[in-house]
């Protein structure tokens, strides 16, 4: 267990469909950090790129995403920084917008997005199936809640994480750029912090 968890945010610009390039870029960033951080965090749907739209409905593309996650896992065999990263996940006949925890050469766990937006430029309810409300993950002895984007806009998701023992919230996000949106996002983040008395990395 660590007493001070060092988190790096990889605010990279993935290309939609370029799974190999996106993975290679993240591996390169991680190798440059060496032992300076405990957790490297990449955005929502980073592996596939975002917005993904109908590309995520292709079986061959989902296979490529799985291969990309496997390659990321191999890169963590050195037992240095863990990776939190977003990617689509196929489960039987459904596709989910998920976040993966990758460490020590393995995909240790995942969580699925609960709140799927379906307005304006967002069309996630058509292509994804929502996950369940779930608890935090344990990374290096710290219980971390990892909601995905829209999840922090609803009180119940963070409340569930807090009630199930989260010590910190790390929310991954990917959205089209909107000039006037930053203040609104900040307001939502502050509301979740005040309601649950938990630190939040966004």
Where is each model-derived feature located?
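Enzyme catalytic cores with a strong preference for nitrogen-chemistry domains
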Residues: 1-202
